[in-house]
Curated annotation (Swiss-Prot):
GO biological process, one term: tRNA wobble uridine modification
Chief place of localization: cytoplasm
Annotated protein name in UniProt: Methylenetetrahydrofolate--tRNA-(uracil-5-)-methyltransferase TrmFO
UniProt-annotated binding residues for FAD: G11, G12, G13, L14, A15, G16
Family according to the record: Belongs to the MnmG family. TrmFO subfamily.
Species per Swiss-Prot/TrEMBL record: Synechocystis sp. (strain ATCC 27184 / PCC 6803 / Kazusa)
SUPFAM superfamilies tied to this protein: FAD/NAD(P)-binding domain
GO cellular component: cytosol
Known catalytic reactions: uridine(54) in tRNA + (6R)-5,10-methylene-5,6,7,8-tetrahydrofolate + NADH + H(+) = 5-methyluridine(54) in tRNA + (6S)-5,6,7,8-tetrahydrofolate + NAD(+); uridine(54) in tRNA + (6R)-5,10-methylene-5,6,7,8-tetrahydrofolate + NADPH + H(+) = 5-methyluridine(54) in tRNA + (6S)-5,6,7,8-tetrahydrofolate + NADP(+)
Gene3D superfamilies the UniProt entry points to: FAD/NAD(P)-binding domain
Required cofactor(s): FAD
Amino acid sequence: MTTLTPIHVIGGGLAGTEAAWQIAQAGVPVILTEMRPERLSPAHHSEDLAELVCSNSFGAKAGDRAAGLLQTELRQLSSLIITTADRHAVPAGGALAVDRGIFSRSLTEQVASHPLVELRRGEVTEIPREGITVLTTGPLTSPALTEDLQQFTGMEYLSFFDAASPIVVGDSINKEVAFFASRYDKGEAAYLNCPFNREQYFNFWQALCEAEQAPLKDFDRETAKFFEGCLPIEELAQRGEDTMRYGPLKPVGLFDARLGDFRDPANKEKKPYAVVQLRQEDKAGQLWNMVGFQTNLRWGEQGRVFRLIPGLENAEFVRMGVMHRNTFINSPQLLTASLHFGDRQTLFAAGQLVGTEGYAAATAGGWLAGTNAARLALGLPLLTLPATTMMGALFNFISSASPKHFQPMPPNFGILPELPQRIRNKQERYGQYRDRALADLTTWQTSIKSLATCRV
């Protein structure tokens, strides 16, 4: 029997730990390299694999919630991370939360004791040029490896700071208030526009100036010094009442065609005082990005203040605005939905490095990248998951979104294909998404011939 060459997994976070486990479970040797404790990142405190550096929660458990559906899919696929999280869960209401220390130590012991896993400690400074490799180095990738990744991908395809605007579910936008238009009617009506009158704008501006900001970590603050080109919306508001109106909220050339012709002098009083524009985020038009609204407000404050925008009174946010250091690649330009680089099929990537958000999403990426790396080593075709599953939809999104405006995305129902019939009740609709996803995942698992390789 031919001896298989070990697959290299670089980075021992959630994605890397899951990837290494899936590779080993498929019968392929794997070398998992984690730079800690030889080199600590600014956020980590231990040498354990899959250390949870922020919250101890994987999000809601219920299958009719986006994070919960992703967890359920991962359970069905025998994810090591989710199985271990279930085993070491602590009371957290409707969320899956864990005892961080026990959780990470348990994962370290399981992975290190696997006969096909070699756990190495030390910094990797460049991407291996030969063999199959899975990159899972996360948002705090070391400077040396970041530089090599830059050389491989090209500077324009690598981001170092995540300054992203909130994303809103299209169905939650009041279309009786918001209107479709492009400035001066040039091209197609590509934007949804939320118009303010003077009083509404003043109230919004005042609330924005008074809203509480989230404190930046030291390593975030250092990066933010070089990020003047993308100021947070609250910073613009602090510079004066009219600053936003002459910046991202400028109303010039925007008019609701339902009110008549904007060139008609009789309609002068109907012109908006300021306008918030939302740009389509996905091909199906279910997600909308608030243009120019990168922000460092606390999440609760964002919901309170941004719902003062006319048309967004009942807005459902699938992602809040964030500003923090976050090394991630432009996945739509570089990756396939199988999570390998288009220019090099033997190089895979997963986790926050590819632009997914959240613990469950990182785990899901590790599962797919690890499974496909093992299949490549075994001469089997690579897998993509059904687009109707949360996993499939997430990786389809990051590999096919607009490269120009790509920002990290958490799991959410807005990226799933629409249901055959429109269901107005949100809870019922999400339940239908869940049922379809799990049924399609079961069918997909059955259709895969090499069950032992895929661990499904």
